[in-house]
Regions:
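Hydrophobic anchor at the beta1->P-loop junction of P-loop NTPases
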Residues: 8
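ATP-dependent small-molecule kinase phosphotransfer cores
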Residues: 30-88, 184-187
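NTP-dependent small-molecule kinase module
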Residues: 137-195
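Conserved lysine of the Walker
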Residues: 16
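Hydrophobic positions on the alpha1 helix immediately C-terminal to the Walker A/P-loop
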Residues: 19, 23
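P-loop (Walker A) phosphate-binding loop of NTP-binding proteins
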Residues: 11
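ATP-dependent NMP and nucleoside kinases share a basic, alpha-helical "lid"
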Residues: 80-119
Length: 195
């Protein structure tokens, strides 16, 4: 069996870490959380004070990820992070799972996690405007990118969908959600795009 490198990406608070950790456990895979790796290995080039977030040194991160993948004994590696497609060398990637969540539900999760002000609205806009999906498609194309609507689903339900794709029982699809159209039809677009 050849090694699979599986990226789990999406807007902050969409459920990446919960899904990626459980997926890695089910696959007996190596789990890599990019934010934790950046902090642990000091792969940080600065801090964005306004957004209260770290700025990752992408070149050093790419080098470290390459080392991890090439040195791994396990068949599967699950990598978790909203910028995973920017730092994991394309040649290693088997699948990119882009998790999507209805912005109305996502806003509640973000507020529960302490997001507010500009950080909240920028991340909601990112989800509405498909930023993580577009980034994944630009790097990997439709063949490797799987868009999953996780709205209202348990982690186990999402894992089941991913395992169906990995097992060849279900294909990858993009164009699954249209948050812009949904919010516009519900008269909520102006409330959510506040940048």
């Amino acid at each position: 069996m050849s090694r699979r490198v599986i990226l789990v990406t999406g807007t902050p608070c969409v459920g990446k870490t919960s899904v990626a950790r459980l997926l890695a456990s089910k696959l007996d895979a190596l789990y890599v959380n990019l934010t934790e790796l950046a902090v642990r290995e000091n792969l940080i080039s600065g801090k964005d004070e306004e957004r209260d977030s770290i700025i990752v040194d992408e070149n050093r991160m790419q080098h470290k990820i390459r080392e991890i993948i090439e040195g791994c004994d396990q068949n599967d590696i699950v990598i978790d992070g909203h910028y995973a497609v920017s730092v994991v060398p394309k040649k290693f990637v088997t699948y990119v799972f882009v998790l999507r969540r209805d912005p109305v539900e996502l806003r509640k999760f973000m507020e529960q996690c302490g997001f507010s002000g500009r950080k909240l609205w920028e991340n909601l806009a990112s989800e509405i405007l498909d930023v993580c999906l577009v980034d994944a498609l630009n790097v990997h194309g439709k063949e490797k990118v799987c868009e999953l609507d996780v709205t209202g689903k348990s982690v186990e339900e999402v894992i089941s969908e991913i395992l169906d794709v990995l097992g060849g029982h279900k294909g990858c699809h993009v164009g699954v959600v249209d948050w812009l159209g949904k919010l516009e039809s519900e008269g909520l677009l102006g409330e959510f795009l506040k940048i």
